[in-house]
Amino acid sequence: MAKRDYYEILGVDRGADKKEIKKAYRRLARKYHPDVSDDPDAAEKFKEISEAYAVLSDDEKRARYDRFGHAGMDGFSQEDIFNNINFEDIFSGLGFDIGNIFDMFGFGGGRRHGPQRGADISYTLDISLEDAYNGLETDIRVPHTKKCPVCHGSRAEPGTGTRTCQTCGGSGQVRQVRNTILGQMMNITTCPDCQGEGTVVEKPCSNCNGKGVVRKTSTIHVKVPAGVETGSRLRVPGEGEMGLRGGEPGDLYVVIKVKPHSIFRREGANLYTEKPISFVQAALGDTVEVPTLDRPVKLRIPAGTQSGTTFRVKGHGMPHLKWNGYGNLYVKVKVVTPRKLSPRQKELLREFASISGDEIHEDKGFFDKVKDAIIH
């Protein structure tokens, strides 16, 4: 399958300047980076736009591409193409894991000799609405990587060390000169022996298999503030994956999920509920008790209240997470019609209907219908 034109991929004109090219790339990166996109082909699309940007943002590579097309890139390896790209600068503020980008293009080791920060991890914590109202402290068990207790992250068996990689001479890269139709090209690849580190361990640690980290499950104490809602994230610094080569560990993000409640529905800091009342209470008015997440409160029902009327109980909703105070509780009254009435109750209702001028056509029972049939 023929490769697409780099300008077409980024959606820019052939005369676009570097600023326009970078802007187009950042826009597409926000859309297709696998960290944020649900598109099953996002990784391939991200690679495609990244390669287009790497070529068009470099004056020399762009000139070769403009003259020879994709044939002008045949002598370049992936590392050659991305050699001068500063992903940290490009993706500043976008929230992407920069380290994973190198792995995505298959040249992870040769570009990262220094310390590498560990990846952030997330943990979903299910809590009740009452917990979200009051706040809570709890312990969670989180699997993550930690520094190997035997080699202390050195990756080498105790008593041994590391030595300079003989294959690459410590550079982490292997250079090969290739003859192409365009002349000699230098091909630079990650050293296959040291994976770009420049050093190799003399004897890998038997406890961690030379990785420098081990996987374990830790018990972590978490304080959940009052007012959190589904989707709230609590950051626990340093409890993510272990960093590499002395890099800082990542962070743990506890993602809150508030379980549905049997009585209340939540919208932000406000709560909603229903309160059944009798038609007598609705007609004459009354004071009723309604539940809250704190304690029952009194609610005045005015005379003549219609079913479906909503009342506000100020300050009895959820606590605000970022400032003092509480939301409101909204109570929707539902007038309940009695299913069974005593003869006296029916008599009083008929009298009420007569006084009100209402003409009532009651449904007759089975025996009343038989009686009418005999008489008539």
UniProtKB/Swiss-Prot annotation:
Keywords: Chaperone, Cytoplasm, DNA replication, Metal-binding, Repeat, Stress response, Zinc, Zinc-finger. GO terms for molecular function: ATP binding; heat shock protein binding; unfolded protein binding; zinc ion binding. One of its GO terms (cellular component) is cytoplasm. Its main location: cytoplasm. PROSITE patterns: DNAJ_1, DNAJ_2, ZF_CR. Gene3D superfamilies: DnaJ domain, Heat shock protein DnaJ, cysteine-rich domain, Urease metallochaperone UreE, N-terminal domain. Zn(2+) 2 binds at C165, C168, C191, C194. The J domain is necessary and sufficient to stimulate DnaK ATPase activity. Zinc center 1 plays an important role in the autonomous, DnaK-independent chaperone activity of DnaJ. Zinc center 2 is essential for interaction with DnaK and for DnaJ activity. Belongs to the DnaJ family. Participates actively in the response to hyperosmotic and heat shock by preventing the aggregation of stress-denatured proteins and by disaggregating proteins, also in an autonomous, DnaK-independent fashion. Unfolded proteins bind initially to DnaJ; upon interaction with the DnaJ-bound protein, DnaK hydrolyzes its bound ATP, resulting in the formation of a stable complex. GrpE releases ADP from DnaK; ATP binding to DnaK triggers the release of the substrate protein, thus completing the reaction cycle. Homodimer. This is Chaperone protein DnaJ. It comes from Methanothermobacter thermautotrophicus (strain ATCC 29096 / DSM 1053 / JCM 10044 / NBRC 100330 / Delta H) (Methanobacterium thermoautotrophicum). The lineage of its organism: Archaea, Methanobacteriati, Methanobacteriota, Methanomada group, Methanobacteria. The gene is dnaJ.
